[in-house]
């Protein structure tokens, strides 16, 4: 089980950074529409097989986010 809601976290981080989904998409080499599909859970971020493997091994997945310092 993934204990984070990655899609919601992405939306929140966009808002905190004052970045649109279009800008985020361009920053990672994709489109704002694709970012929107991820946020709306139409396309998953995490590979389902990876999650199943970790669950079979007895693990939950917990992600942490650490803001990098701008140099």
Describe the role of every protein-language-model region.
Residues 29-44:
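Recognition helix of helix-turn-helix/homeodomain-like DNA-binding domains
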Residues 68-71:
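Short acidic DE-rich linear segments
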Residues 24-25:
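Short alpha-helical "recognition helix" segments of helix-turn-helix
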Residues 10, 21, 32, 47-50:
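Helix-turn-helix DNA-binding elements, focusing on the entry/boundary residues of the two helices
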Residues 1-17:
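A short, Lys/Arg-rich alpha-helix, primarily the initiator
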Residues 48-63:
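DNA major-groove recognition helix of helix-turn-helix/homeodomain DNA-binding modules
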Residues 19, 30, 59:
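Short glycine/serine/threonine/alanine-rich loop segments
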